[in-house]
Amino acid sequence: MRHQNKNHKQRPSFLSQFLVILWFRTKLSIRDKKFFILGILLPMISIGASIILNNVLVFGPGSDFQKTNNNLNNNNIFITPKTLNSQQETLINTMKLQYSLNYTYLDDDTDLPNYIENKSLSSLDYGISFIGSNGINIYYNSSIESIPSFVHSFFISLFKINGINLQLNETITVLSSEVTFDAFYLLMPMILQYGFVFFIPYFAILIVTDRDKGFKNHLILNSLRTSVYWFGNLVFDYLIFLIPTIIGWILLYSFKIDGIYSDNSGKSFLLFLTFGISAIPFGFVLQFIFDKEETANKWLYPFTSIVTSIPSALISVAFPTSTPLIVELLLSILPTFSFCNGLKALTYNNSSTVSYTILIQLLSGLIYLILIYFIDNYKKPKKNEIINDEDSESIINNQIIEDNDVLNEKEKIKRLVRDGGGNNNNNKKNNSYPKIVVDGIYKQFIQPKPTLDKPSIIERCSGGTKATKKNSIIKKAVDGIWFSVEKNEIFGLLGPNGSGKSTCLNLLTGLLKADQGDGYLSGKSIDKDKDVFQSIGSCAQNDILFENLTIYEHLYLFSRLKSITTTKSELEDEIDFYINKFSIQSFKNKKSSDLSGGTKRKLSVACCLIGDPQVVLLDEPSTSLDPISRNELHSLIDELKVNKSIIMTTHSINEINQCCNRVAIMVDGKIRCIGTPNHLKHKYGSGYTIDIIPNNYLNNSYEIHNFMAQTFPNATRVERLGRFISYDLPSQNQQSLSTIFRILQSNKQRLQILDFSASSSSLEKVFLKFANLQEEINKQQTNNKSNIINNNNNNNNNNNNNNNNNNNNNNNNNNNNNNNNNTNNNTNNNQLIN
């Protein structure tokens, strides 16, 4: 039994929709292999590499030993300067008494470092350079025991001067080289950074996919709040980020990794947490650069790696211990740089740097959130500046007199809007107002006039020239239409390709923005009210389904987004009702990627209708369905129209006849007729239609035409489609259909007619009349474009010819001038000779 939603006018709360988005993203993620690789595996690999690196580059254990008798005998020692003060002399003499050393005094101006450098390693051991009365420089051989032994002996001698016998124990620990020591502090932050950097493009590409495949708009059109979409994705991505982050930090702390296992361990944990707060919104900002999933997959990973990681690597090499403050501030806008800089500060126990890095990551995260809000609003569809171009008006279009029914509908809508019928408050007070009101919406597309000329460099760099009447072709996709849809009514938009019906639906769903006019859904303005889609069900022409969700999960998602159900059983009843109605029980637990085209279409319509939306927008709902399924769908839509206002675009006359209470036929962006199917059939139908197929068109068509003119004087030849010759008989014709049939049958052999048919005019014939009109308009527009190209080419040729003529004239003038000059010169020469 189906649960009737008593709260269908209300939209679920922010929290309810937020929880649905978390559930939805969880389902998609656990079925995505890329999620486990980039979201879990890579971060854990980087953490494991850091632990291994810390154990491999260990700085010990070395060896401990004691020396009570340091034998420095026979070692060489160089002393400078020669002249020493009394204290310095006493120190040297004491050392002479203690140890049998080979003392060499160098000249006062001797540069001891250079002197030692030029000596062979075997001949030098130690050097002492006295600087003034206080300073002493000690030079020593880099052999492992030289400096401890010499310092040991030096201090024993120093204390001996004061009569103190000093006993020192030496402990020598073998350490790795200085380069190896610094390598860990350089590599560990970079390795951790690279492990976590791929979170950024992975989450960002999911948003690009939503936008490219229409998922985002589809969810919003089906009652999801825009704020819930962004907030839900941000929170879910951050929760996923926390899984490897917390596990990884615990492992790093357990293995006592330098910087993590320290007095700053609390700050190190906060550094990891705040990195996600900054990095995820940063990725969401980057994704606005891309419109296609394929392009984002190709470029976002290397782009993110270069932009965020290369600066960190360069700074780590250029400033291994301390980065200049101005450089840090400039690059801190990049989350991975801040993260790497904070990790480096941890390894050097720089607590203050870690603290302000945490603050920077929090601040940058806030900045990116603000950017997301403004960019998302900026990228929404915009109005075009209306360019009135009389030349773009179709001659055929101008010759058509607007239908009285269309004019009456227009006046009704204008009066309704003027009286406040489109206003939200008035709509609440008076439930009799139409749920859908279209008030003169107008949309034009502007294209540059075709030309063979290449744009200039300036035009290419600036994105082209500004659209004007002279350099543009204006296509009026929707040329000012007015209509309304009442409750419990299905309104059909019928028209050939290019007539503007799909554009009209895109304007009502917010995918396009009207250049003029407005629409109202349940009393809310499409142009002005942000929550206009709070009780909407939308089914696009192409199936917008999530490949990794089952049929049941799709219906669960859209039901939770659109309806308020009090219990789980009510929700189950609602889902089961639509599964049974659409006869898709056997595919209930199948993913949409495994469904046939017809089953996918059924699921799309079911997702649109579930949740009892007040306004339903169906774009060719019976596409891909077989005839039986199509008839079942028509019956189902008619059954479920209670308390709904439905707009349906279609090419099918049968769909109009079976489903629609009223229909509007669109041609070239305008509504040409509007009313019930029967009203249009009687108003525009011509009584009867006769179709004749001659044995030989060339030989028999003239005789057939003369026969029709004599027998049926009011008959009008309409068209020739292949071998068919069609005639319309007006309703004023006095002969019945049976009489017409008998006359044609009796003359069939004489006129050499292969076959014929006679029938009452149908809505299909009415539609074909307007379709022919659309075809003539399209031909005229094509001819106009060809004429524009020819005119441009002729102008270019004329300009070239004029330039050539000017060049020829210039050449002739130059030749004449030269001849005149030669004549004058000859005359002057003759005069000189004479």
UniProtKB/Swiss-Prot annotation:
It is found in: Membrane. Residues 779-834 are annotated as: Disordered. SMART domains: AAA. InterPro entries: AAA+_ATPase, ABC2_TM, ABC_transporter-like_ATP-bd, ABCA, P-loop_NTPase, R2_ABCA1-4-like. The chain crosses the membrane at residues 35-55, 188-208, 235-255, 269-289, 297-319, 324-346, 355-375. One of its GO terms (cellular component) is ATP-binding cassette (ABC) transporter complex. The keyword Endoplasmic reticulum does not apply. This is ABC transporter A family member 11. It comes from Dictyostelium discoideum (Social amoeba). The gene is abcA11.
